Amino acid sequence: MQAQGIRAPRTKGGITMIDVTRPELDDAITRAWQASPEGSAAAVYTPDIERVLQGLCANRFEAHYCADAAEARAYLNGKIDGKKVGIGDSETLRKLELHEALAAHNQVHNVLRSPINKGTTFFEYAKGTLLTDVFLCSVNALTEDGILVNMDGTGNRVAAALFGHEKVYYVAGVNKICPDLDHAIWRLRNIAAPRNCLRKHKATPCAKRGDRCYNCASPERICNGLLIEFKKMSNMDMEVVLVGECLGL
């Protein structure tokens, strides 16, 4: 059943989008990008959303565009029903309030929100996200030609995103879009990682100074592993839900 208040998506060349016009799309993306920390720089980079969606489809991902967080929440809440759902650590998903929406009609396994039984370690509990029907997370960056890039410290998020589910959903705001792979990796190290270290109160140079990556050797470093998904993984459905506003870090 279609969620109330959401327009029926249209499909074009394998891309599904809420029924918006190109001028509406361009205006939304420009406003969202300029409102983001990256977009506040003197030279404003405006991503080509149609190229991103086409690139994702060319790389075998399903691609869906939603104008804002409310539409994205309603879309995902309508798609995922009666499933065992794993949710990775994500400021984007917190902003969408997906845990609350999905928990009403799914069994949600959230490493940050679900209660952990006494005597169960985080390692043991986090392994549970590998065994769910559906897994949701965000991306640290994605390129205009549809490549997904993530960096992880513990590895549970990227491990869960790679294998073992019926479907994985990546949810990303337009602030995560980068022109190419070099810029995407730069964003991971100099924007996403310092902000996440600061959020998690890590004792790392990037968190203390808040400006860039220092390629440190701190035991609390969170950029230990880099995952680049050039194409969709085999034997599992993967969908990228792109949201036309600034979300996450």
Language-model features: locations:
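Short, Lys/Arg-enriched N-terminal segments with co-localized hydrophobic residues
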Residues: A3-T16
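Generic N-terminal amphipathic, Lys/Arg-enriched alpha-helix
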Residues: V20-E62
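Short N-terminal helix-initiation segments at or just after the protein's N-terminus
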Residues: P23-A32, N110-K118, W186, C246-G248
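Catalytic cofactor-binding cores of redox enzymes
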Residues: A28-Q34, G78-I80, V158, G164-H165
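Flexible, glycine/proline-enriched loop segments at strand-loop-helix junctions
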Residues: G39-S40, E62, R113-I116, V168-N175
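N-terminal active-site beta-alpha-beta segment that forms phosphate/nucleotide-binding
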Residues: Y45, I49-A126, L131-L136
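Conserved phosphate- and dinucleotide-binding cores of soluble alpha/beta proteins
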Residues: L130-L249
